[in-house]
Design a protein with these regions (language model features):
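Ligand-binding loop in jelly-roll beta-barrel domains
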Residues: 10-11, 21-45, 126-152
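A structural signal for the main folded, soluble domain(s) of proteins
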Residues: 77-79, 84-92, 108, 117-118, ...
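A short, N-terminal "cap"/entry segment at the start of jelly-roll beta-barrel domains
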Residues: 32-77, 157-158
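Short histidine-centered beta-strand/loop micro-motifs
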Residues: 8, 27-29, 82-83, 92-96, ...
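Short acidic-glycine-tyrosine-enriched beta hairpin
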Residues: 5-24, 110-130
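Glycine- and acidic-residue-biased ligand/ion/polar-headgroup-sensing regions
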Residues: 1-6, 87-89, 96-112, 118
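Conserved hydrophobic/aromatic beta-strand scaffold that supports enzyme active sites
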Residues: 16-18, 69-71, 80-84, 101, ...
């Protein structure tokens, strides 16, 4: 919601911004905005900056009918993407050797352990297994896989 801005420009709702360690910016918002932030969650050697308007980007078909995938970033076996689930779409049982984090942005996602509405955050540990499916309205999720157990960059010292 709203518009996030910095000296590089304005980022309307739906923009994915990735600023790796060593970069800097002066963020602000004139009218206010809601943003999702993960600081210092970068694997060693991962230095790519990304600024992507997801509302205009080309989505790809997913691994099952009813899924659309928009890759956001990939490095060393760690992948971040948006995944759009059509209503009632089911994904087969699968395991995440490197763990998985999900932020439900729209709709409802379900699995054997629960029902996750918009705003829900899931952190599934390494080697977790599930069979997710979308609710009646479908779902849009932000998902990151392969990063739990990765070698992280050290936090900066003041």
């Amino acid at each position: 919601e709203g518009v996030f801005s910095d000296e590089h420009g304005d980022c309307p709702a739906g923009t994915y911004v990735r600023n790796p360690p060593g970069t800097s910016h002066a963020p602000f918002s004139t009218g206010g905005c809601t943003i999702f932030v993960k600081l210092w969650q970068f694997a060693a050697g991962d230095n790519e900056s990304v600024r992507l308007d997801t509302t205009r980007a080309a989505w790809q078909p997913g691994l099952v009918a009813g899924l659309g995938v928009l890759p956001l970033h990939e490095h060393g076996g760690i992948s971040t993407a948006l995944v759009r689930w059509a209503p009632g779409t089911r994904f087969h049982a699968h395991t995440h050797p490197g763990g998985e984090e999900i932020l439900v942005l729209e709709g409802t996602l379900h699995d054997e352990d629960g029902d996750y509405r918009a705003g829900s955050w899931l952190r599934n540990p390494r080697y977790s297994r599930h069979s997710p499916w979308a609710g009646e309205a479908g779902a849009l999720i932000y998902v990151k896989v392969g990063h739990l157990g990765a070698e992280w960059l050290p936090l900066p010292r003041d």
